[in-house]
């Protein structure tokens, strides 16, 4: 199945990438999925294969991405197969009447972002750090001509394949890559999304320049990241952990982040949303049983993390490549 997917992916991306770039990204993808796969990949693929096959209705333009109808398949068998892909972090989904209540309400983020986007109709889109692909499917449903999601987490790719199993004709592709692994020659995309990635990067300016390089002239960047309150000189670098995460490096103020974007050559920079992350938006569920945001906050003061830093606050900025 993975070989078939990679072949279809290569055909689907031929109009987007030069032969040199396509060859490089597909070689790295094959290495990670076929030649030197993750040790749990056979188990995940067995769970995927246990899902029913064949065409069904898919509703991907709504908050809960819905595959099939209740009663169309054996719900217990579907649930057992989907449980083989736990933890589910980004969603929500419903497969044949089985709700998959993911850790994140990714639909809430989409509701904050979508009103401020240029029309996605006919656009070529890159979604960096795409997770399970939830937002990729929303972008396709909004009319994108091609959506490429990249994320190095192989389980997320298998979760994407669970949806693709029933929507094989949509132009949505997942590559198991990091942004810095895309070849430098770029400029293919009309819109680039980076949501929940920047604070994990040791060099945030390099990440912004990589995003800019992927955009065509006049293309739109949608950047969502953790921020702190303050002026254009304010940035938080945690001493060790932030919200129990060791891989968080820079949390700028919106003003500082705007300056970073401008220094990297973006224009028309604007902040379109800024909001605190609630324990209703990110929490443990039966489909993600590990610790989540409520465990990462000060138990007596949810305005602080366990380390005493300001609790997670996220901003969405939109900018343009001239």
Swiss-Prot record:
It comes from the Bacteria. Keywords: Transferase, tRNA processing. One of its GO terms (biological process) is tRNA wobble uridine modification. One of its GO terms (molecular function) is methyltransferase activity. Its EC number is 2.5.1.-. Signal peptide: none annotated. InterPro entries: CmoB, Mo5U34_MeTrfas-like, SAM-dependent_MTases_sf. It catalyses: carboxy-S-adenosyl-L-methionine + 5-hydroxyuridine(34) in tRNA = 5-carboxymethoxyuridine(34) in tRNA + S-adenosyl-L-homocysteine + H(+). The keyword Aminoacyl-tRNA synthetase does not apply. Pfam families: Methyltransf_9. Carboxy-S-adenosyl-L-methionine binds at residues 90, 104, 109, 129, 151-153, 179-180, 195, 199, 314. The keyword Transmembrane does not apply. PANTHER family: METHYLTRANSFERASE (PTHR43464), TRNA U34 CARBOXYMETHYLTRANSFERASE (PTHR43464:SF95). Homotetramer. Catalyzes carboxymethyl transfer from carboxy-S-adenosyl-L-methionine (Cx-SAM) to 5-hydroxyuridine (ho5U) to form 5-carboxymethoxyuridine (cmo5U) at position 34 in tRNAs. Belongs to the class I-like SAM-binding methyltransferase superfamily. CmoB family. This is tRNA U34 carboxymethyltransferase. The gene is cmoB.
